[in-house]
């Protein structure tokens, strides 16, 4: 299928993969838990070292957690800062909070105190929920008025709390993520569901698939490991690289098809301590997606492919835009990062100021990548931040790239911020 036939500028598009796909007008909890659960109630939704939730169980835990959270907020929607390390508990809180129509900020529990202070000041939560005693101690000592509770305090709470009713604004800020420059970016139900639809369409993922999530859920890579496979009614194995032998056993037991790792994390696989993980990946994975934030070498990519004996599939994305460009399992070159994801349009911007150029990629040597898609952030911390990131309706990336006649993009350099 030619790219021209599906709305791109030139070149090739993978067969049987939609270029554009409508995003359902439903909430995140409905699209990822409730609706898949009607079809596959007893199918595993999330697996961790601590246990398994089927879709039926996760739906029940979501409802119970929602009511428990609302019992601490007088039954009203609130702003929640979440710093939970245990994966299954974190999943319960995320979906319980969004179903309760709360806005939440997914935090890194291991943040230094000064960063913790800065981020909590920016988000101004009504309630902080954590399972980390040190984090609670740090948060309690901060000069802010939010109540800090341990996750365990949610147990048994919420009896008699009514479920929120009425029309929900699916484009309002729902989940905040931290940006690299210290600010926050806000995603809506719509933008996060769009990411789930688009990534699961592009890869593609099916209801029979199991995806390995190795990144924390406060990162975009973590969310894109979990949400897309849930949208398809599949399973996510939530693990980490911290215990290589335990991870290797889990991979062999559950046999995931894909995983997504940032480049620095993927580089750890060369260390001798991860030899058992490498062997398990060789036996089970169909490919490893590696997210990059700038230029890379084709030789480095080939080295990783040779290590794993499986495709090293590169992806460029960010907290504000989600996945933007990616290798496809059936279509990639070693020197190219890939093609635009399903539902993603990219346009050349002037690298000197970020303004959209008046000519397409085919007519220029290089330009900054501008992004427009339903996955981009719903809002930023301040109007000044929004003005910095959005130019002429296109999201800036500060990445200079070039496009070849096949529509593949090559990352050239990063513009100093």
Tell me what each language-model feature is:
Residues 1-53, 57-72, 78, 133, ...:
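N-lobe entry segment of adenylate-forming
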Residues 339-343, 354-391, 408, 414:
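Conserved ATP/PPi-binding loop(s) of AMP-dependent carboxylate-activating enzymes
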Residues 51-52, 66-111, 213-216:
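Conserved AMP-binding/adenylate-forming
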Residues 189, 306, 318-336, 349-355, ...:
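Active-site loops of AMP-binding adenylate-forming
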Residues 257-260, 272-334, 345:
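Gly/Ser/Thr-rich phosphate-binding loop
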Residues 72, 99-158, 166, 252, ...:
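Structural core segment of the AMP-binding/adenylate-forming
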Residues 193-210, 218-258, 272:
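Conserved AMP-binding/adenylation subdomain of ANL enzymes
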Residues 54-56, 167-197:
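Conserved AMP-binding A3 loop
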């Amino acid at each position: 299928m030619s790219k021209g036939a599906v709305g791109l500028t030139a070149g090739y598009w993978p067969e049987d993969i939609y270029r554009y796909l409508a995003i359902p007008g439903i909430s995140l909890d409905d699209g990822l838990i409730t609706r898949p659960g009607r079809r596959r109630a007893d199918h595993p939704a999330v697996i961790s070292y601590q246990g398994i939730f089927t879709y039926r169980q996760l739906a029940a835990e979501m409802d119970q957690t929602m009511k428990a959270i609302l019992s601490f907020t007088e039954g009203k929607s609130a702003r929640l800062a979440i710093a939970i390390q245990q994966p299954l508990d974190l999943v319960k809180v995320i979906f319980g909070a969004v179903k309760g129509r709360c806005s939440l900020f997914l935090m890194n529990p291991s943040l230094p105190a000064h960063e913790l202070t800065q981020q909590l000041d920016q988000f101004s939560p009504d309630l902080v929920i954590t399972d980390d005693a040190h984090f609670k101690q740090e948060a309690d000592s901060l000069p802010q008025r939010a109540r800090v509770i341990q996750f365990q305090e949610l147990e048994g709470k919420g009896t008699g709390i009514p479920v929120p009713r009425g029309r929900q604004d699916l484009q309002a800020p729902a989940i905040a993520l931290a940006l690299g420059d210290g600010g926050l970016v806000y995603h809506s139900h719509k933008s996060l569901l769009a990411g789930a639809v688009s990534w699961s369409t592009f890869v593609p993922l099916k209801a029979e698939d199991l995806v390995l999530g190795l990144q924390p859920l406060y990162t975009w890579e973590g969310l894109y490991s979990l949400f897309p496979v849930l949208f398809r009614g599949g399973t996510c194995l939530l693990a980490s690289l911290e215990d290589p032998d335990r991870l290797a056993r889990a991979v062999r037991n559950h046999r995931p098809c894909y995983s997504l790792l940032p480049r620095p994390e993927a580089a750890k696989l060369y260390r001798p301590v991860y030899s058992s993980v490498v062997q398990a990946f060789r036996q089970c994975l169909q490919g490893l997606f590696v997210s990059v934030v700038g230029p890379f070498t084709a030789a480095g990519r080939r080295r990783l492919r040779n290590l794993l004996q499986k495709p090293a599939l590169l992806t460029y994305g960010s907290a504000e835009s989600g996945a933007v460009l990616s290798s496809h399992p059936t279509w990639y070159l070693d020197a190219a990062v890939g093609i635009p994801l399903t539902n993603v349009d990219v346009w050349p911007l002037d690298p000197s100021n970020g303004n959209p150029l008046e000519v397409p990629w085919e007519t220029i040597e290089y330009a900054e990548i501008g992004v427009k898609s339903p996955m981009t952030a719903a809002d930023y911390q301040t109007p000044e931040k929004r003005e910095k990131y959005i130019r002429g309706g296109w999201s800036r990336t500060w990445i200079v790239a070039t496009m070849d006649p096949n529509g593949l993009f090559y990352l050239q350099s990063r513009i100093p911020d």
